[in-house]
């Protein structure tokens, strides 16, 4: 029997993991084993919110070395991370400045400035990317305005996954799916947009032309001396997660649920019309030339911060207590910029409820209930927006990623959206990473072929909508109120 051993390095905003995948060609089975899991998080350094890329690199190398120490022959390695953030290098490949995180406040006020100076519609027509205040476009503008002394030293700007691939191989690459998240790639040419780059203040020479997933960047020399190919996978973690979403037919939507929730659908063509612009829809690059038409939702970041501030260690117990509470007593907009990185998330949630004359969530369970209900309602709104955009309703929603283990939120989502929810796989980004590696090794034909493997090997759970649930009645009441207002307008 023929085996392939592929390693996925999957870095998220709150944790990272090195995973070993074993693929059996004859029976088309795929098994995952966690080799090394480690924490990731924000740090304060010289007045900036930053990432500790040295610690992350050490953890990656530790995980890879563990695989080699077991005597396993690695066939390939792939790295995926979050989007928009970058590392600057000089001509010798040494870092310039700090690896600033997207939650830093340095970009405050720059997005409206860009819209005024370049035109909101023009930016959107060029990039097809949603307006988020921390997009790379605004981060680079902040850098060039606030730290001009760094500019003469910069020779290269590498996005996070490309930086770690460079550290392993010594070769530079600019992978397409992640590059599109910057709001700097022209949606028609798939290359860096010169007008947007000019506004950012960055030099085009800092970047190489984006390359699509599936090429070998270079090789990592393992401790035993073997050269192991490092593959340019779909290096934006959501792009990898979508590859591993077992989407079945054109009426399937996906929700990649983690620190961020990203809801969308696959399309062969982008959506950049007025409706898409008004809804702030993004058209991020995917594998095989597909577009990930989606919308960012703040996601479980709010819960992560509450758990941290309240020092809650038993999440299952919290969810059980939350489930016993009535629904929809405390509703916030999770996508409000006030929740990007407040000093105290609990206080910020309570303030938002107070300002809208709602009861104030005080207990741990009440805060969690507020977050879960608010997310489910926002999921329903976004799914409706996406259906209107493409002119066709969805028949099912695939929730993938770590957040799909939250059965309460899955059921709330099914009830609020009125749609069948299929939860799983949990390690979607890792699996999608592995999928591209296997295609590069000529073990699989394409993304659809890989999804068949996922469908037969992953643990999937179905949640059926309950029209009699509290949140379903709440949604129906909102829709009725909206229709009445429209008739009376």
UniProtKB/Swiss-Prot annotation:
Its EC number is 2.7.1.5. Disulfide bonds join 68-222, 353-370, 413-417. One of its GO terms (cellular component) is cytosol. It is an enzyme of class 2 (transferase). The keyword NADP does not apply. One of its GO terms (molecular function) is glycerol kinase activity. Belongs to the rhamnulokinase family. This is Rhamnulokinase. It comes from Shigella flexneri.
